[in-house]
Every structure is written in C-alpha cells, then in structure tokens.
C-alpha cells in the first residue's frame, strides 16, 4: 500500500489537528456538569456516553496523518482506563494542552528534546508533591469518591459504598444489566483470581475485551492439556448440552487450544480456557478451592484421574464467569454455600497450626477470596440506551473507588493540581531556557482540568482559576461556590491523577519530538459494478453450485484422520462450523 509522508512542522501540525479533534469531543465529559456524547451504532440504538475512552475510540479522521494524532491521544485515554479505570478525560485534557503549548514553543525555535526533558523533570516534581498530599481513605470517604466519580450521582455512590462495605477489599464487585427499572445490589458466593483468557479469540465483548459465560460448565484440572484426544469425550457431551464451557487447567496449549479457538469462532462451542492461578502446591490448593465453590471434581494426576474419563457429572457450574486478559471472576450458585463455609473453617484451622508466617499469609489470602463473596450491582433503567449509559458510569465510579483504596485521595476538582502548579512556578530556574520552558508547560497544563470543569458548568475558566488562587479555596462546580473541597467531600483518587499525568506527558513528549509521520494513503472506493449509470441489479448471474456436503466440522470428533475434530485440510470443502465439533476443512 502506498504511503503518505509528512515532515517537520507539517507533521506535528497534522498530528495536533488529530489531537485537538479528539480532545474537543472528549473534554465535554469532565466534571459534575459534564455533557453527554451520542455515538451512532450500525445496529441497535445509539449509545449515550460520558466516558473519555469510549468517545476517543469511536473517532476516525479522513486525513491519515491527523488520524495518527487522534489514535495517539486515544492511546492515552485507553492506557489510563486500563491502568486506573478512570481519569481518561483528565489525561486527554492534559495531553492536548501540553501538545499545544509545546508546538508553539517549537515553532518559536525551542528544542523539542530539551522541552521533553523539561516536561519529564516537571512531571517528577509533580508526582513527588502529589504523593505528599495524598491521604488514606476511610469508610465514610468511599461514598464521597464514588459519588464524585459518578458525576455527582448519589444513588451510584451509595450502592458502591454498600457493596464495598459488605464484601470488603478482598471481595469482588461486578456490574451487570437488570431486567427491572431499579438498580439493585445482590450479594452471592464467588471469587476472582489473577489469570485471564488463554487466547484473545475467546473474547465475547470486543468493546470491553472480556469473555462472558452465562451458566457455564467448568472443567478443573491440575494437568496440562496439549492434545485433542483428552478432550474429545467431554467436548461431545458439552456440545449435546449446548452449555457454555470453561477449561481451567495448569496450562492449555498447542492442538487443544487451537481446536477450542476455532470451534469457538465457528460457533460450534461457546468455550474459553484459563490457566490455573498460583504455582506449585499452592496452585493445586487454589484449584481445590475453586472446585468446592463451583461443585466440580478436581481432575488430578495425584489420584490417577484421566481427562478422557471425565463425564459431565464431574464438571462444576456457575451463574456467570467474566474473564478479562488478566483476571477471572466467578459468580457461584448458592447451593455450594455450606461447602464453602466448611472449607473456610478448615483453612482457619490450618492457619492456627501453621508456623511459617509466609504460609499463614497465603492461607489467609485464600480465606479472604472464598469468604469475601461477590457483590452484583444489577443496573436497571427504562431504556436500553439509559442502561448502557448508567452501567458505564457505575463501572467508572467503581474503578475510581478501588484506586482510592489503593493509593489514597487528594482534593478533587483539580484543586490539588492547581496547588502543585503554584509550587512548581516558584521553584528555581534551570540553566537551559528550553528546559525551563518544558517545566512551564507542565505548570500551565495542571490548571487546565479545573478550567474545563468550570467551562462545562457555564463559568469562565480563567476567572475561576484567578478566584481559586485569590480565595485559597476550591471550586465546587455543582453549586458554583468556592469551598474547602475536602470538607465538601469532593475527592479524587491519587492513583487516577498520577496515571493521567504520566500517560499524558509520555504521549505529548512523543508528539513534540516527532519529525516524520508516515501513514497509509486511503485506497479509492471501487466503482459500482457495470460502471456509471449501470443498472445496480444487473449482471448478477446465477448462483454457483453448492457442491457436496463436505462442510468443515460435519463429522464426529477425533484426531486428524478420524473424521471430525482434526487439523485443517482433512476433509471436504465448505463453510466452517456448520456441523459437529471441528476444525476448518474437516469431514
């Protein structure tokens, strides 16, 4: 494909255009008086969102170089979302102002490299001061943080606070859609562990990059699975039951993993695979815990149990399993509650007789995972569009609350950044003029989130900043008053602010030091068949013959050469996944 090249100031200006386009669309979503963004969908109703990352992902520009800038700032939002779960709009706003100020100075003759060094030096100072201002969160602050992160929605703040109080920091909180109009909180058995899907091809929700299995059957084993032979009998039973299926094993690889992926993508099986958590003996113990939670039988080598002998009665079950790239959450049925309690009591007795402090800590971690349970926030709304909107707000708020528990909180509304900006401007100057300019770029950027919060609330951002400095109070955009924001309960998670700063400086510095941009030249759209003025329905001809019924996956299950589940190219030609379990091209 031919490439379009752009050099020097031209490349940076085009990148800036892309940055500005995305940032201008995103920054209306910050603060308690934020505005919504409506996103068209090819199928179904439009989405109404107030989330920076979601908006940024949807934007594609005609100019290839500008589109690179759009994708770079989308990366800022996505990375901040992935790491902190919130703060995407703040990161986007910071990136935009840094790029704008940096390019102004480069056009005036400043060295991009020296500016980058100055920005990085300024960032280091800001992060030190941010850490010193952070305070640990207490119980009453959880609801305040959740409410602020939900755009001032007190109902959401209250629900998240109750959920955190019930399951504690060791429990799991999940968000799902409800059939009712009300948003409800439900506590059930369950747990999570730090392992994700074995292949991204198992993803069922592309936008959120997760795999969700409703009422799945679960195979749990401490064995490695690499060949298809071991799985064939149980896969045949699963296909007959039409149940979703999760394989939780020490490892799953090679032919076995490939076969599961292909049958998943061809629609033959709704399946996923996850590696077992922990290591060594602790891995087996963790699998035993999960087996008890789900009512499964642990298929263990120690008991001379073979995978090919597994029946559907040996499998566990769950209400729902959600798998991301690095985490698995199991929502269990209540019928295993007594077994879980007995398991917890057994583990507590183990703690009492264990001498090693390290071993005690590990057993206590297992107790916390089993006993913590899962809090289900069931989101209700009058319409599907409202439900999706509300669900996104709750997820953002939940992520912000978790971040606050991890690293503490600071004064919200951008107030802490304004204080640090003042302190930064009073520091001694560096020898290099451009290095100083880089620090000044950071100093100015720290004011921008508050300015935008004020603009979204209908106030002049510059006037608000001046009043904040004069009165030495924060700006409450909810009521337009200047207050002590800590006392007003307006708090921001330190982790969210830290990651927004780090990610924005990283991308802004890369854009400022770019000298050449290379992008694909879009190919012209192909003309309509028959040329201009031709009948669009003409020339369709007859349909080709269907040939034989040698469609892939039509046969039974087995290894290559056995008829059904085999490697590609083993049988007749046809569409994948039309029949039984199989790989493409199997008979």
Swiss-Prot record:
It catalyses: ATP + H2O + a folded polypeptide = ADP + phosphate + an unfolded polypeptide. It holds the Pfam family Cpn60_TCP1. It is found in: Cytoplasm. GO terms for molecular function: ATP binding; ATP-dependent protein folding chaperone; isomerase activity; unfolded protein binding. The keyword Nucleotide-binding applies. It comes from the Bacteria. GO terms for biological process: protein refolding. Its EC number is 5.6.1.7. Coiled coil: none annotated. InterPro entries: Chaperonin_Cpn60_CS, Cpn60/GroEL, Cpn60/GroEL/TCP-1, GroEL-like_apical_dom_sf, GROEL-like_equatorial_sf, TCP-1-like_intermed_sf. The keyword Chaperone applies. ATP binds at residues 29-32, 86-90, 413, 492. Keywords: ATP-binding, Chaperone, Cytoplasm, Isomerase, Nucleotide-binding. One of its GO terms (cellular component) is cytoplasm. It is an enzyme of class 5 (isomerase). Its main location: cytoplasm. Together with its co-chaperonin GroES, plays an essential role in assisting protein folding. The GroEL-GroES system forms a nano-cage that allows encapsulation of the non-native substrate proteins and provides a physical environment optimized to promote and accelerate protein folding. PANTHER family: 60 KDA HEAT SHOCK PROTEIN, MITOCHONDRIAL (PTHR45633). Belongs to the chaperonin (HSP60) family. Forms a cylinder of 14 subunits composed of two heptameric rings stacked back-to-back. Interacts with the co-chaperonin GroES. HAMAP family: CH60. This is Chaperonin GroEL 1. It comes from Prochlorococcus marinus (strain MIT 9515).
